[in-house]
Amino acid sequence: MAHVSSETQDVSPKDELTASEASTRSPLCEHTFPGDSDLRSMIEEHAFQVLSQGSLLESPSYTVCVSEPDKDDDFLSLNFPRKLWKIVESDQFKSISWDENGTCIVINEELFKKEILETKAPYRIFQTDAIKSFVRQLNLYGFSKIQQNFQRSAFLATFLSEEKESSVLSKLKFYYNPNFKRGYPQLLVRVKRRIGVKNASPISTLFNEDFNKKHFRAGANMENHNSALAAEASEESLFSASKNLNMPLTRESSVRQIIANSSVPIRSGFPPPSPSTSVGPSEQIATDQHAILNQLTTIHMHSHSTYMQARGHIVNFITTTTSQYHIISPLQNGYFGLTVEPSAVPTRYPLVSVNEAPYRNMLPAGNPWLQMPTIADRSAAPHSRLALQPSPLDKYHPNYN
């Protein structure tokens, strides 16, 4: 008995704890099986994973809240329309906002300058710090300023209140762009910067200069073409008029052939042209016809003051001066056809004064005259018989019988 009691006294406190734990676990171990231990370990691992995921979810929520202001302050990477859109949509800025309809932006210029434009880096939004430069940027991107009309009432109290409101509203500026509207950020793609005149490419300016030069040359060619057509039309009209008056235009060969046959001197009332000029019939008729008709007064024949007239035909008279020939017809109400050609026959009579001229009493006073050989155009009436008949102008002559 003494030996047993000594063994019980030698038991340490640790042994007592292990014995107590074994006594407490013994009921549980009695009801557990080997497969239940595996299930228990899986449950413990799952609970540990849930706790670890919960701790991880709480920490990113704090980091996201810290990083959002950094994204909002990153205005340097945005263009002007998107910067403007962002500050209008933000509640942080009080100097700029939408109007009631959301179609215009309202800017308090004084407050806008202090709140946004005068901010320093790294919080600067726009590159400029002047309100005029900012308004110029708005105009370049298609924003237009809208004037607000204030209606005043006749009552004093309401008038004063409206006056205060108008003074406040006068500080506000309204700007409109059809592609800048509240709730339509997709329209910002259409808000583009306008290209100024100074930034135009030199290729376009060279193209415009070449186009103007070509247009000027084309216009000059058209004017020359029109003048040529007008000259041809005038020649055709004169030629048709001469045909209607039975006055054919005489060529150089026919004139020289007729002059070689015979010559009769007559007097002419217009001065001779310069010897150096040689003009064709079609070119000289249009310019000299009116001057010759104004200068000619009368034409007298050398033989007994009579005029020659063909019966039923027109007789063309060729008069020669010192250097040129003139085809003159006294018929058709004083119409004279004129052809100027170089002279091939020497002058029969030189230039004579009025006092020395024969039959000077037959000439009007102050009318110079000169001797010119005259030949009837036989080609115009080859078979006609000429007859001397008194002219109706002889009735007014003092020597008329």
From Swiss-Prot:
<feature type="region of interest" description="Disordered">
    <location>
        <begin position="1"/>
        <end position="30"/>
    </location>
</feature>
<dbReference type="Pfam" id="PF00447">
    <property type="entry name" value="HSF_DNA-bind"/>
</dbReference>
<keyword id="KW-0539">Nucleus</keyword>
<dbReference type="InterPro" id="IPR036390">
    <property type="entry name" value="WH_DNA-bd_sf"/>
</dbReference>
<keyword id="KW-0238">DNA-binding</keyword>
<keyword id="KW-0805">Transcription regulation</keyword>
<dbReference type="InterPro" id="IPR036388">
    <property type="entry name" value="WH-like_DNA-bd_sf"/>
</dbReference>
<comment type="similarity">
    <text>Belongs to the HSF family.</text>
</comment>
<protein>
    <recommendedName>
        <fullName>Heat shock transcription factor, Y-linked</fullName>
    </recommendedName>
</protein>
<dbReference type="GO" id="GO:0000785">
    <property type="term" value="C:chromatin"/>
</dbReference>
<keyword id="KW-0963">Cytoplasm</keyword>
<feature type="compositionally biased region" description="Polar residues">
    <location>
        <begin position="1"/>
        <end position="11"/>
    </location>
</feature>
<dbReference type="InterPro" id="IPR000232">
    <property type="entry name" value="HSF_DNA-bd"/>
</dbReference>
<dbReference type="GO" id="GO:0005829">
    <property type="term" value="C:cytosol"/>
</dbReference>
<feature type="DNA-binding region">
    <location>
        <begin position="76"/>
        <end position="194"/>
    </location>
</feature>
<dbReference type="GO" id="GO:0000981">
    <property type="term" value="F:DNA-binding transcription factor activity, RNA polymerase II-specific"/>
</dbReference>
<dbReference type="GO" id="GO:0005654">
    <property type="term" value="C:nucleoplasm"/>
</dbReference>
<keyword id="KW-0804">Transcription</keyword>
<dbReference type="GO" id="GO:1990837">
    <property type="term" value="F:sequence-specific double-stranded DNA binding"/>
</dbReference>
